[in-house]
Regions:
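Conserved beta-strand-loop-alpha-helix hinge in the C-terminal portion
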Residues: 225-247, 494-521
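Conserved ABC ATPase signature
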Residues: 144-148, 152, 415-419
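Conserved ABC transporter NBD signature motif
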Residues: 64-76, 337-345, 354
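The feature captures the beta-strand-to-loop junction immediately N-terminal to the Walker
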Residues: 41-43, 314-316
Length: 562
């Protein structure tokens, strides 16, 4: 740590938003010096986003409420600095990159900030070349931002901040949008920035991956208050393993100490008997080619997805995972080949008609939310599909309950734009559930969610009456392995593997070629699990190993302790 004076000083920070009854964050104190990396972790709603807003000046300049304590940057109070000046010191990468990108092309996006500073064109061009190399996005130069995948947008958002050359980098939940190999590359980049003398604040739910950054300290928040601030080792001993995704060996150590509670979720009932469902496949792709403009993304994809299946789609950023389901919803049209739903070609069906079959949740919730209140968002779809208004209240209550939003203060009258990214993501899922679809399609369902929330709604939706199948795109390997019956593995617009999780994992070279990396839970299941058995959730596997119970095929993907 190169300098005597900290870059960041937080002294007794407490903040309560207007109309809220309780503070979002309470009595947080923290200093960050040049060259230091601080990981901020904690359950959803613990105050992480509020802390970010206080660091970058959005509190108190844009978010009003009751503020006490102080935040100082290079010795100056944030409250006394204009936002323009704060933004030159603190660069923030948002959870949802779609809300951060304003340029039509990658080059114009990278140039946007420096142009607003009045930098000469040649300086900007040189900086674009250097930043594109450092951010590993040279291959994106020349592309339109509207055609980028979610992970590619995440890297572009990071590059846009690099263009501004701030002293402090605040990065909010970047890993959910990135495949594991690209996520590791981003973490290396952040460590390089710290080694160059920058301060780095990483807010992340996926703690196991974030620890590869080797943070100097961890700030762990619970219910808005600091529970722990110190080295990684102490954090692993105090963090709630049911809310924070810890390395498996840390969970096992906690289980041996009796600190991992039994799984509180009841196992879902068996999926609908495939024989009882219409024999036609839910989705059939036959030699599908599709893309955006002149750029083809899917190259001759053929696959059949059945009702009564839970299917996870994994693969590198930009490999065609999202495009696969956009083609099913007619959000894009194949250039050749065909897509059929329940045996009928999609070209003969309208998007509204397909909405009666599929509940589709975009990767970015901002693409789905437009109404003034949460209540209006939830009633819009049922009203347009002709669902009896007398049933709306029950649909709304059930949908909010399944995604863990029912108990949020005054939730129905809140504006969706005031919700956190994680809450917006859960609201988007609730909107899809309110349509009572036959099949739920989720793009990155765990983005912005803590471990408990992601596991909870993935289990809860399986019990919805009439819901036959769940198809989800994810970079969360553990989520796929513990919840899916089947995995489709994508690479370069083609399916390179298709089968049950354990069979797909057998070819480790192919796994690595698809930018996937073994997790500690994956290795523990593979080493200790019974051959052919389902993957167990981390807490369940840890409790069994702690009790020295034999591992047999005793349970499904719910992972509940018996």
């Amino acid at each position: 740590m190169a300098a005597d004076r900290p870059l960041v000083e937080v002294d007794g920070l407490t903040f309560r938003y207007r109309r809220a009854t309780e503070p979002a964050i309470r009595d947080v104190s923290l200093t960050i010096s040049p060259g230091e990396v601080v990981l901020v972790a904690g359950p959803s709603g613990c105050g992480k986003s509020t802390l970010i807003r206080a660091l970058n000046g959005l509190i108190p300049h844009s978010y009003r409420g009751d503020l006490s304590g102080e935040v100082r940057l290079r010795g100056r109070t944030v409250a006394g600095m204009p936002l323009r000046e704060t933004s030159l010191i603190v660069g923030t990468v948002l959870q949802d990159p779609a809300r951060q990108i304003v340029g039509a092309t990658v080059e114009t996006e990278l140039a946007f900030g420096p142009e607003n500073l009045g930098l000469p064109r040649e300086v900007i061009r040189d900086r674009i070349r250097r930043v594109a190399t450092r951010a590993r996005i040279e291959h994106l130069i020349g592309r339109e931002t509207s055609e980028l995948s979610g992970g590619e947008r995440q890297l572009l958002a990071m590059a846009g901040i690099l263009m501004m050359e701030p002293q402090i980098f605040v990065v909010d939940e970047p890993l959910a949008n990135l495949d594991p190999a690209t996520a590791a590359t981003l973490l290396v980049m952040l460590r390089e920035l710290a080694d160059d003398g920058h301060a780095v604040v990483l807010v992340e739910h996926r703690v196991e991956e974030a620890l590869e950054l080797e943070p100097d300290r961890v700030l762990y928040l619970e219910a808005g208050a600091p529970r722990y601030l110190g080295p990684v080792g102490g954090f692993l001993r105090v963090a709630d393993p049911t809310s924070v995704k810890l390395p498996f060996e840390a969970i096992l150590a906690r289980a041996r100490a009796g600190e991992v509670p039994p799984d509180e979720w009841s196992p879902p009932p068996p999926r609908t008997d495939p024989a009882a469902v219409d024999s036609a496949a839910r989705l059939t792709y036959l030699d599908v080619h599709a893309g955006y403009g002149e750029r083809e993304v899917l190259h001759g994809v053929s696959a059949t997805l059945q009702p009564a299946e839970t299917v996870a789609v994994l693969g590198p950023n930009g490999s065609g995972k999202t495009t696969l389901f956009k083609a099913a919803m007619r959000l894009i049209e194949p250039t050749s080949g065909s897509v059929s739903v329940d045996g009928a070609p999609t070209e003969n069906r309208t998007v509204a008609d397909l909405a009666r079959v599929f509940g589709y949740v975009f990767q970015s919730p901002s693409q789905m939310l437009f109404a003034r209140t949460v209540r209006e968002e939830l009633t819009y779809g049922p009203r347009n599909l002709g669902i009896d208004p007398a049933d709306h209240a029950e649909l709304i209550a059930d949908s909010l309950g399944r995604v863990g939003l029912a108990d949020e203060e005054n939730i129905l009258e809140r504006a969706p734009q005031t919700l956190s990214f994680g809450q917006q993501k859960r609201l988007a899922i609730a909107i899809a559930l309110a349509l009572r679809p036959q099949t739920l399609i989720l793009d990155e369902p765990s983005a912005g969610q803590d471990h408990r929330s992601a596991k909870g709604f993935m289990r809860s939706v399986r019990t919805i009456p009439g819901l036959e199948s769940i198809y989800f795109v994810t970079h969360d390997v553990d989520l796929a392995l513990t919840h899916a019956d089947r995995i489709l593995l994508f690479r370069d617009g083609r399916i390179v593997a298709d089968g049950p999780p354990r069979l797909v994992l057998e070819d480790e070279d192919r796994w690595i070629q698809c930018n996937l990396r073994p997790t500690s839970l994956m290795r523990a299941n593979a080493q200790r699990g019974a051959p052919g058995s389902r993957f167990l959730a981390a807490e369940s596997l840890a409790r069994r190993l702690a009790r020295s119970e034999p591992l047999t095929e005793m349970e499904g993907s719910d992972g509940r302790d018996r």
